[in-house]
C-alpha cells in the first residue's frame, strides 16, 4: 500500500521509541515509493501525534509537539490527539472515537480530518489549561 501512496499520515506517540519508528517509516516513504522510483518527487507527508498530554509535555515528561514535528521528524503536524479516556471506551465498545463528539479525542480527530480535507481549523486541547483562581490561591 505504501508503494503506491500519494500521501501518508504518520501516526506517532510523544515517546522516543515511537518517534524513532516513525522516523524509519519516513525514510522508507522517502526512498521506496513508486513516485520516488519514477523520479516524480516524494509523497506528501502529514503527522498525527496521539496520546498527547500538555501537562506532561510542559513538565518535560514527554516530547513536545515541536520536538516531534519540527526538530526530529520535520513533518508538518496534521493533528494532535490528546490522551483521553474515551479512546479506551470507544475501543471497548467497537466504535470509532471520532463519534465521541463531546470528548477531546473525538473533537481532535474531527479537526484532523477537516484539515486533511483542506479546511482550516485551530489546534485544540494542546496547551495546559490555566488553573482557576482557587487552585492558584491554594497552590493546587
Summary of predicted features, one role per range:
Residues 14, 82-85, 104:
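Short beta->alpha linker loops
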Residues 91-108:
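C-terminal boundary of histidine-terminating zinc-finger modules
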Residues 125-140:
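A short, charged, Gly/Pro-tolerant segment at domain boundaries
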Residues 1-76:
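Conserved catalytic-core segment of NTP-binding enzymes
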Residues 68-96:
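Beta-strand-loop-alpha "switch" segments that mediate conformational coupling across diverse proteins
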Residues 104-123:
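Extended, charge-rich low-complexity interaction segments
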Residues 34, 123-124:
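Active-site phosphate-binding and catalytic loops of NTP-dependent enzymes
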Residues 22, 81, 109:
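Residue-level signature of catalytic and energy-coupling elements of molecular machines
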Amino acid at each position: 500500500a505504501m508503494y503506491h501512496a500519494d500521501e501518508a499520515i504518520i501516526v506517532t506517540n510523544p515517546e522516543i521509541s515511537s518517534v524513532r519508528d516513525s522516523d524509519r517509516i519516513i525514510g522508507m516513504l522517502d526512498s521506496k515509493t513508486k513516485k520516488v522510483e519514477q523520479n516524480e518527487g516524494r509523497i506528501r507527508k502529514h503527522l498525527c501525534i496521539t496520546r498527547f498530554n500538555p501537562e506532561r509535555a510542559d513538565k518535560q515528561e514527554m516530547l513536545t509537539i515541536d520536538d516531534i514535528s519540527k526538530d526530529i521528524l520535520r513533518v508538518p503536524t496534521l493533528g494532535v490527539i490528546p490522551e483521553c479516556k474515551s479512546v479506551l471506551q470507544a475501543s471497548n465498545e467497537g466504535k470509532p472515537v471520532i463519534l465521541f463528539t463531546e470528548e477531546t479525542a473525538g473533537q481532535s480527530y474531527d479537526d484532523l480530518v477537516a484539515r486533511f480535507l483542506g479546511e482550516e481549523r485551530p489546534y485544540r486541547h494542546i496547551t495546559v489549561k490555566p488553573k482557576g483562581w482557587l487552585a492558584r490561591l491554594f497552590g493546587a
